[in-house]
C-alpha cells in the first residue's frame, strides 16, 4: 500500500472540531433558555391574546374597545388585576416552552445534520432549504407536544374578572384545566386547535433559526460587530422581527380557535380566516401585532441569547 493510500485510510483528526450537544442535552438547554425568556415577556402575551379576541366577528367601534394600545392595555391590566393579571398562565407557559422550544431549539441541529448527511453527504452543510425544513420539523414536534399546554395558557390569559374578552373559563390551575377539559370533551378536547397551532409553530420555527444564523453570518461577513453578547442580541432581534411577520395571521387564528368552546365559531383554521375577514376585514388577522412584536422580539432575543449560554453550560457538563 502506498504512502498516499495509507494517509487516506487514516481517520481525519480535527482538534478544533466543535462539539455538538446531543438531543437530550439540546432539549434541556433549549427549554431552560425559553423559560428564562418567557418570564420576562409573558405580560405581552397576555395583552396580545386579549387584543386578538377583542371584537371577535363584529364591527367594533374603536371608541368602545377596552384595550386600545399596548401601553394602555398594560396599564389597565396592572391597575385592575395586578402582577397576577399580567402573568396569567405563566406556570403553564413554562411547561409549554419546555415542550415547544425544547424541541425547536434542541432538535433543530440534529435534524439539520441528519438532512445534510442524507442529501449533501456533509453534516456541516449549510443550505437554506435544509435549514428551513429543519426548523419546520423541529417546530412540528414542539407543536404536537405543546398544544394542550398552549390551549390552557390561552384560556387562562383571556380570563379577566374586570374586562373579559372572548370565552371565559376561569381555570384555577393547569390540573384543574386538564380535568375540566377531559371531563367535558374527553382527551381529544386537549388537542382542540392543534391544527392551527401546527401552522403557527411550523411557520415561525421554519424561519427563526435560519434568520438568526443568516444574521450572524452577515455580521461576521461585513465585520460589523465583534463576537459577544451584542452580536447575539442583534441577530436575535432580526430573527424576532422575521418570526413575528411570518406567524402573525396563524397566531390570531390559533388564539381564537383555542378560546372557542366546542367549535361554536370556527370549524377549522381556514374557516376562521374566512369568517374573520368577512366580519372584521383582512387586517383583523393582524390584531395584536404590536403586542406580538413587543413579546416575540424580546422573547427571541432573550431565548437565543440565553441558549448560547446554556449550550456552553451543558457542553461543559457533557465534556466532564
Swiss-Prot record:
Keywords: Membrane, Mitochondrion, Mitochondrion inner membrane, Repeat, Transmembrane, Transmembrane helix, Transport. It is found in: Mitochondrion inner membrane. SUPFAM superfamilies: Mitochondrial carrier. GO terms for biological process: mitochondrial isopropylmalate transmembrane transport; mitochondrial oxaloacetate transmembrane transport; mitochondrial sulfate transmembrane transport; monoatomic anion transport. The chain crosses the membrane at residues 26-47, 91-111, 129-145, 197-217, 233-253, 285-306. It catalyses: a dicarboxylate(in) + sulfate(out) = a dicarboxylate(out) + sulfate(in); (2S)-2-isopropylmalate(in) + sulfate(out) = (2S)-2-isopropylmalate(out) + sulfate(in); (2R,3S)-3-isopropylmalate(in) + sulfate(out) = (2R,3S)-3-isopropylmalate(out) + sulfate(in); malonate(in) + sulfate(out) = malonate(out) + sulfate(in). Gene3D superfamilies: Mitochondrial carrier domain. GO terms for cellular component: mitochondrial inner membrane; mitochondrion. Belongs to the mitochondrial carrier (TC 2.A.29) family. This is Mitochondrial oxaloacetate transport protein. The gene is oac1.
